[in-house]
């Protein structure tokens, strides 16, 4: 079967939820038995988002093959079963980087390199390669129509219709239809102007998704269809909802999937959304409620911890517990003391880089350990737990990570190239100083709490870090009571730790949040929320 392409653009304003809309449509098509994948094309010049500040761009989502990608790929994986890879996300910077590399290598045989055809051809080639073996590829174009940065992508997708055939391409445009309170009606003019802008580029949209805070009336949809030259049944109202997991059903109720399958001549059964109905039911009918504190330094933009926040809510679904999330700046712990943590039912320290706020995280880990509060540390959250335990239990008062103090007396966390043999000779490794990225196997210690949670010995989880627990100091830490619960496949690197003297104190070097989905959850987060509920009950019994 020939691959079909759905190109999704945005208009009027940004942040309308284009990624969620794309993922929701993909979920419906997948529920019809189609093999679906999604791409995100980002117009910024960075080669990838790996070095962009989380405060500016949100989290970096890591794929199984180790690509550092846009957070929208996290939405894609949470809505469909297909796993994303480095092929599913690229930027303007990556395209130019690759084209210039080829030019320097002489691949273009001295030709003058231009946006058309060299840049656009590279974009089209990547789209076609990603679509191989799939029935439908949804391609989300980042940014807003009219932005200068998006023009090469828009030109490339315009050309795609001529290359793969108009019968196998569909252009979908998502716009804002604002409600004007003073007039008491929605206004369609911004959508008309946005479509006009798209037409000037040579793209006639086939489907319009109208975002609004309320349902767009049928007469207004008919007006949009008339002025924008779109079929009336292809003008879809997408109102605000209290849960993003209601959007697949909302789109299906307007027969968007039927329209697309008819357009592509796809013969497939009706979508079965029973799994999503179950998710919505669990979300609407909790039997309990807990408060989890996320202690980090990027809390000014919650999207910096998007996958962690979503994973906590997924765990709440599995436990039928509503999860209230309290974002706490780690520097506030330093300046205002750990008292700001006292009303929490559980504490999570997520990943991060840099020294700012790290002492507040160490104080938080100590508070959770001493007060017997359920604790989940992720990446840096595991490293600060190691540092805290070494300082206050294992007899290493000056313990630290070399990321923060390069010449510390007890470098319990360090680059592998900074580990020292007992005779003080540097132990070198070709792994040192490199970022560990992507999915890697971890061997769990039989009988550990981690083993009980996962229910198996070998697990696969995704990594994004440079620093590791220093094996040269590990024996002293273990002798003080901390348990290594998981090791890398070669038994050389610590992947998980736990504290047996605590009811639920676990930390991982990997990022389990990237494998959590609303339909399946994740065992580590599910166990964490269950422990939070049990802790809450114990505290109530003490009153």
Curated annotation (Swiss-Prot):
Active site: 379, 511, 513
Binding site for CTP: 14, 147-149, 187-192, 223
Regulation: Allosterically activated by GTP, when glutamine is the substrate; GTP has no effect on the reaction when ammonia is the substrate. The allosteric effector GTP functions by stabilizing the protein conformation that binds the tetrahedral intermediate(s) formed during glutamine hydrolysis. Inhibited by the product CTP, via allosteric rather than competitive inhibition.
Listed name of the protein: CTP synthase
Note from the entry: CTPSs have evolved a hybrid strategy for distinguishing between UTP and CTP. The overlapping regions of the product feedback inhibitory and substrate sites recognize a common feature in both compounds, the triphosphate moiety. To differentiate isosteric substrate and product pyrimidine rings, an additional pocket far from the expected kinase/ligase catalytic site, specifically recognizes the cytosine and ribose portions of the product inhibitor.
InterPro entries: Class_I_gatase-like, CTP_synthase, CTP_synthase_N, GATASE, GATase1_CTP_Synthase, P-loop_NTPase
HAMAP family: PyrG (MF_01227)
Similarity comment text for this entry: Belongs to the CTP synthase family.
Gene field: pyrG
Residue numbers binding Mg(2+): 72, 140
SUPFAM superfamilies: Class I glutamine amidotransferase-like, P-loop containing nucleoside triphosphate hydrolases
Binding site for ATP: 15-20, 72, 239-241
NCBIfam families listed in its UniProt record: PRK05380.1, PyrG
Pathway assigned to this chain's UniProt record: Pyrimidine metabolism; CTP biosynthesis via de novo pathway; CTP from UDP: step 2/2
Domain called Glutamine amidotransferase type-1: residue spans: 291-538
Function: Catalyzes the ATP-dependent amination of UTP to CTP with either L-glutamine or ammonia as the source of nitrogen. Regulates intracellular CTP levels through interactions with the four ribonucleotide triphosphates.
């Amino acid at each position: 079967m020939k691959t079909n392409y759905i190109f999704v653009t945005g208009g009027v304003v940004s942040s309308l939820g284009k990624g969620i809309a794309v993922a929701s449509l993909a979920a419906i098509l997948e529920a019809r038995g189609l093999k679906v994948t999604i791409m995100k094309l980002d117009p910024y010049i960075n080669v990838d988002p790996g070095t962009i500040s989380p405060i500016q761009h949100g989290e970096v989502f890591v794929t199984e093959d180790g690509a550092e990608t846009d957070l929208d790929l996290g939405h894609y994986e949470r809505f469909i079963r297909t796993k994303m890879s480095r092929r599913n996300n690229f930027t303007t910077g990556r395209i130019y980087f690759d084209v210039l590399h080829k030019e320097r290598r002489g691949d273009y045989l001295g030709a003058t390199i231009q946006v058309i055809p060299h840049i656009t051809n590279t974009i089209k080639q990547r789209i076609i390669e990603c679509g191989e073996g799939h029935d439908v590829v949804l391609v989300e174009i980042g940014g807003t129509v009219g932005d200068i940065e998006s023009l090469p992508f828009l030109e490339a997708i315009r050309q795609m219709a001529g290359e793969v055939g108009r019968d196998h391409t569909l252009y979908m445009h998502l716009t804002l239809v604002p409600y004007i309170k003073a007039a008491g009606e929605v206004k369609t003019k911004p959508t008309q102007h946005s479509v006009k802008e798209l037409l000037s580029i040579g793209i006639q949209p086939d489907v319009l998704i109208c975002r609004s805070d309320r349902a767009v009336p049928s007469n207004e949809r008919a007006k949009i269809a008339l002025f924008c030259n779109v079929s009336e049944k292809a003008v879809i109202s997408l109102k605000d909802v209290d849960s993003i997991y209601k959007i697949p059903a909302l789109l299906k109720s307007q027969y968007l999937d039927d329209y697309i399958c008819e357009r592509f001549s796809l013969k497939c059964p009706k979508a079965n959304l029973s799994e999503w109905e179950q998710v919505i039911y669990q979300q609407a009918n909790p039997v309990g409620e807990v408060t989890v504190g996320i202690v980090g330094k990027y809390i000014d933009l919650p999207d910096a911890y998007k996958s962690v926040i979503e994973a906590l809510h997924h765990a709440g679904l599995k436990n039928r517990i509503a999860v209230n999330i309290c974002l706490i700046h780690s520097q506030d712990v330093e300046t205002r003391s750990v008292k700001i943590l006292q009303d929490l039912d559980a504490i999570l320290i997520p990943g991060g880089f840099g020294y700012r706020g790290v002492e507040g995280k160490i104080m938080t880990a100590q508070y959770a350990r001493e007060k017997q509060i359920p604790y989940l540390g992720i990446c840096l959250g595991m490293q600060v737990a190691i540092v805290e335990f070494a300082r206050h239990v294992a007899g290493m008062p000056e313990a630290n990570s070399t990321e923060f103090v390069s010449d510390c007396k007890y470098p319990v966390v360090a680059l592998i190239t900074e580990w020292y043999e007992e005779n003080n000779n540097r132990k070198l490794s070709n792994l040192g100083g490199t970022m560990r990225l992507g999915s890697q196997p971890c061997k769990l210690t039989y009988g550990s709490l981690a083993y009980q949670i996962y229910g198996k010995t070998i697990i696969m989880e995704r990594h994004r870090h440079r620093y590791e627990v220093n094996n040269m100091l590990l024996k002293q830490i273990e002798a003080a009571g901390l348990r290594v619960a998981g090791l890398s496949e070669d038994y050389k690197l610590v992947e998980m730790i736990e504290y047996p003297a605590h009811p639920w104190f676990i930390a991982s070097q990997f990022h389990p949040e990237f494998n959590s989905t609303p339909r399946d959850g994740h065992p580590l987060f599910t166990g964490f929320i269950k422990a939070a509920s049990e802790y809450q009950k114990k505290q109530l019994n003490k009153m």
